């Protein structure tokens, strides 16, 4: 009697899961060193308890936990007056109304920040890199920057309205 040798098996489910786990681990490690600088590098510093006292729940969620508000939920998306948009966490002037435009996304959008007002880092939270924008004075999360904005920069700073305060001129 001759024995039939089995054909080589396709990669097992277990092997596929191992590869998936390895890739996930690599993505996590890649993201670890790419966030905002440590709080010690910022001009404005508070403890977590102090931030919780200073900010509303929604501001804390956006600014300190890098959350995102619902589109079209902020009245600042439709703000048309001349003035300055400042950080709701520390009052740092971030954007001029001269750089604001209607992106149609439902979030306040700007083609540039005031000089030195914001910093950026790479955010991998949704599986691919995005440019996160944060307050340069303490690192609070503001939103993200995309490459689909108008001239002169071609950038769209898509900002959570709850992270902003508006000061009319």
Can you name each region flagged by the protein language model?
Residues 84, 132, 155:
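Residues immediately within or flanking Cys/His clusters that coordinate Zn2+
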Residues 80-109:
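Mid-length scaffold segments of soluble, non-membrane domains
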Residues 63-80:
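N-terminal post-signal-peptidase region of extra-cytosolic proteins
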Residues 30-62, 70:
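C-terminal segment of N-terminal export signals and the immediately downstream linker at the start
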Residues 87, 135-138:
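Short cysteine-rich clusters marking metal-coordination/redox-active sites
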Residues 1-11, 22-26:
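N-terminal secretory signal peptides
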Residues 96-97, 144-145, 167:
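Short, non-ligating residues that shape and space the ligands of small metal-coordination modules
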Residues 91, 139, 162:
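Cys/His-coordinated zinc-binding microdomains
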């Amino acid at each position: 009697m001759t024995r039939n040798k089995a054909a080589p098996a396709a990669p097992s489910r277990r092997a596929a899961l191992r590869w998936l786990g390895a890739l996930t681990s690599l993505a996590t490690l890649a993201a670890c060193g790419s966030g905002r600088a440590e709080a010690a590098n910022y001009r404005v510093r508070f403890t977590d308890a102090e931030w919780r006292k200073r900010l509303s729940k929604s501001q804390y969620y956006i600014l300190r936990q890098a959350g995102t508000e619902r589109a079209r939920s902020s009245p600042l998306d439709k703000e048309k007056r001349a003035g300055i948009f400042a950080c709701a966490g520390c009052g740092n002037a971030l954007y001029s109304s001269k750089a604001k435009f209607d992106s149609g996304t439902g979030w306040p959008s700007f083609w540039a920040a005031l000089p030195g007002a914001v910093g950026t880092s790479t955010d991998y939270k949704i599986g691919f890199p995005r440019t996160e924008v944060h307050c340069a004075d303490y690192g609070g999360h503001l939103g993200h920057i995309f490459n689909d904005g108008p001239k002169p920069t071609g950038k769209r700073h898509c900002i959570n309205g709850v992270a902003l305060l508006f000061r009319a001129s």
